[in-house]
């Protein structure tokens, strides 16, 4: 089925109801929320109305091309405890009126998870995926940009045009997420699969397989947050296309570009010359333990003051 804007409202309403029912049954002391998708906005609303304090992970970031940007900042204002993954994001949360005493940068859970993930060998990936990985690998994901309506078709066509111009690469696409215009992107990908060899498409690879491919990939390309947040762990060369991640901190292994063919080609010619050795700015020690300990021991106060700068 085609995804429509009305579906977002329906899922948001459903999320509020489900969270409300869980709160009635479980009676939690705190609601922990990670990220900025519309589904969890419903959980934040239900928790706020039920007077349950909220601990929010990944606040303070910017994604100026997506609805997620406004959702993220809204959840920040609902929340009483904050875990940004970078000091720049911490500063932005303070700008939103949150008390610095409630904001803690312990690093990113994603970066920590990758550091602890058992990466699969190339031979194992070949068996699982039934693909002979005997050429350079390009890992690609392209999502709809929710604040750029009716543009997804042209945007994915430009990416496909660029990838079609390359030879001697294995291109592995993962599915776009469940947003408006997802079907437009999938339709173009299906056409591409039929035209060019060594193109593969997976609805979902799972975390371990995806991370393992990312480590050995020659290039990651698209507009997924994983390209910005996760590739620095391996220093994998990455092209971030368009505005979906615009505003996020960009590591030296990543280059931004516009949607058109020439911009993507220019970015490719630049990024292939860069070194892979870069530190992950979101990686710190004992991130999960520090977050969990703070959530358990923090003194929550539902009566929040606005912190003026």
Labelled PLM ranges:
Residues 1-100:
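Active-site and donor-binding regions of nucleotide-sugar-utilizing enzymes
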Residues 33-34, 41, 56, 82, ...:
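A donor-sugar binding/catalytic signature common to diverse glycosyltransferases
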Residues 78-154, 303:
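A nucleotide-sugar donor-handling region in carbohydrate enzymes
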Residues 84, 104-106, 201-203, 255-260:
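Short acidic-hydrophobic, aromatic-tinged amphipathic segments that line or gate anion-handling sites
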Residues 120-216:
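Donor-nucleotide binding loops and adjacent catalytic segments primarily
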Residues 229-274, 279:
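Catalytic binding pocket for nucleotide-activated donors in carbohydrate/polymer assembly enzymes
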Residues 272-309:
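C-terminal amphipathic helix plus adjacent low-complexity
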């Amino acid at each position: 089925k085609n995804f429509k804007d009305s579906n977002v409202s329906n899922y948001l309403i459903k999320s509020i109801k489900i969270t409300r029912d869980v709160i009635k049954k479980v009676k939690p002391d705190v609601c922990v929320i990670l990220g900025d998708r519309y589904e969890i906005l419903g959980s934040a609303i239900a928790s706020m109305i039920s007077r349950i304090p909220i601990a929010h992970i990944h606040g303070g970031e910017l994604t100026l091309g997506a609805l997620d940007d406004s959702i993220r900042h809204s959840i920040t204002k609902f929340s009483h405890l904050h875990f940004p993954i970078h000091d720049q994001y911490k500063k932005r949360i303070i700008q939103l009126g949150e008390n610095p005493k409630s904001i803690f940068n312990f690093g990113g859970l994603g970066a920590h998870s990758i550091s602890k993930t058992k990466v699969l060998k190339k031979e194992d990936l070949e068996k699982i995926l039934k693909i002979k990985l005997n050429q350079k690998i390009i890992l690609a994901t392209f999502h709809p940009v929710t604040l750029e309506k009716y543009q997804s078709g042209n945007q994915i066509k430009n990416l496909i045009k660029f990838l079609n111009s390359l030879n001697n690469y294995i291109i592995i696409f993962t599915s776009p997420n469940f947003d408006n215009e997802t079907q437009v992107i999938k339709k173009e990908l299906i056409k591409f699969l039929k035209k060019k060899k060594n193109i593969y498409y997976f609805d979902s690879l799972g975390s371990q397989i995806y991370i393992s491919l990312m480590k050995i990939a020659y290039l990651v390309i698209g507009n997924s947050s994983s390209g910005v947040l996760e590739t620095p762990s391996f220093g994998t060369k990455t092209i971030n296309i368009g505005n979906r991640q615009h505003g996020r901190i960009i590591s030296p292994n990543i280059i931004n570009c516009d949607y058109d063919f020439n911009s993507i080609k220019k970015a490719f010619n630049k990024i292939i010359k860069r070194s892979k050795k870069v530190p992950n700015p979101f990686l710190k020690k004992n991130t999960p333990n520090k977050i969990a300990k703070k959530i358990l021991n923090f003194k929550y106060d539902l009566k929040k003051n606005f912190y003026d700068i």
